[in-house]
Amino acid sequence: MRGAANLTSAMEVAADLRQRILLGELKPGARLKIDDVASLCDVSHMPVRVALQALEAEGVLDVYPHRGAVIRAVDARFVRNTLELRAAIEVMLTEKCARLIDKDGLAELEALVLDFEQAAQSQDPLAVVSANLRLHEAINRVAENTEALRVLSRGRLLIQALRVRYGFGPGRVENVIVEHRALFRAIARKDERRAGEIARKHCEGARDELLALL
């Protein structure tokens, strides 16, 4: 039972740290000491160690012997490399989604497209980022490629934190709404090629616009 409790605590610690990183309370380059995190989250050392290992696996932390964990530094190269990799993978997954999706899946995507548009009206970067992630996760899941999803998850939190920090440039959210609608139509028509083209343009636009904000 103690092992299960430690695992639950570790999951809670990891979730807490993710939220703090996302909101900018913990910034790239910050060192996370086990003692400090344990005090912050009111847990023992073991759940903290497990949580830090999980975040390292997600590409969020670098862990060094005798130095502890450090939130990965984020610069233009990191953003460019991460989003170019995302583009390559999401094009593949989106094309497969267009081929495999069923009526229930389409209904879910349509609802998530609308959820994003409602979030956009709030002008809250965190709400927009979260709604965008839910939509793209739903598209990507249809392809049933867990290895691709694992790669996509690496470093994603750090990109999201940049979005929450810097927001979106003029007209970007409006462009995203247009692209989401076009992407949904292509998927609904099972037009794999067009869906892939839109996905690539969508990812490249996100990359270029975020780099311009740095």
Where are these regions (language model features)?
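Short amphipathic alpha-helical interaction/hinge segments
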Residues: 159-170, 207-214
